[in-house]
Amino acid sequence: ALDHWMARIETVKRSLVGCVSDIVKIDGFLQEPSGVNAAGEPIALNFATGEPDARTLRHPDGVILDIGTHVLAMLRETVRYLGGSDDMTLQVVTAKDRLGRAIAKGDMSTAEGEAHLQGRISGVPVNIWLNKYAGPAGGQKGLRLCLRDGRIISYDRRGAEDVLELIEGKDIQRWHIPGTLYEHCLAGHILGTSSLFERDPHEVSRTTRRRIEEVELLLTLQQQLRGPH
């Protein structure tokens, strides 16, 4: 069980945070760019080409399961490698369709276009912001860590690279990590000379378990949001 976002742990690799207890709040984001149709309504864009997505998205192809898995994997791997536990809780604060209407109980067909999830990972308060219709420019695709000492760490995807920032008042340190997320995941976890299988074979099953737990939790949120199905 894999998710390419689980390789986005430069915060850990660059030792920007000492341990998980240094974090007071985490925000996770995946806010995708969108277009507009002839009726002036927001439409999804193809991830690879940027062209309008011709598919009609239906549940379960909404943001909670489709892209929530990416953000949750990134947050949990970051917390885990900072010494945190695998404990997590989440609830749906809001879930809306493509046109901004709340998903109703009993609706088993409409896909969520936007959702706000809230909970804790290893005891740290977490908010996850998912949006498939975030406008022409989209929004942040990564995380934001608020540290106990007042510093902020921002992790984003910009074009063909990841951008990591350490923000202290008006001072910003910035690192650029080129390459696709798939490349980093394959090299760091699967096929590379220092893959997870080589570095820590026992961690493979634990990593798999975390990915399965995340999908199970998001499926549970759908049951709570829509009713048993």
What do the predicted segments below correspond to?
Residues 106-114, 118-190:
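NAD(P)-dinucleotide binding in Rossmann-like oxidoreductases
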Residues 94-96, 188-229:
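C-terminal helix-rich "cap/oligomerization" subdomain common to oxidoreductases
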Residues 15, 33, 78-82, 218-224, ...:
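Phosphate/oxyanion-binding loops and surfaces in catalytic or ligand/nucleic-acid-binding neighborhoods
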Residues 48-137, 209-216:
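Rossmann-like dinucleotide-binding domain that binds NAD(P)(H)
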Residues 8-10, 36-42, 103-105, 140-141, ...:
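Short aromatic-enriched loop/helix-cap "lid" or pocket-rim segments at secondary-structure transitions
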Residues 1-48:
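A contiguous active-site-proximal alpha/beta segment in oxidoreductase catalytic domains
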Residues 5, 9, 68-75, 112, ...:
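A structural signal for well-ordered alpha-helical scaffolds and beta->alpha junctions
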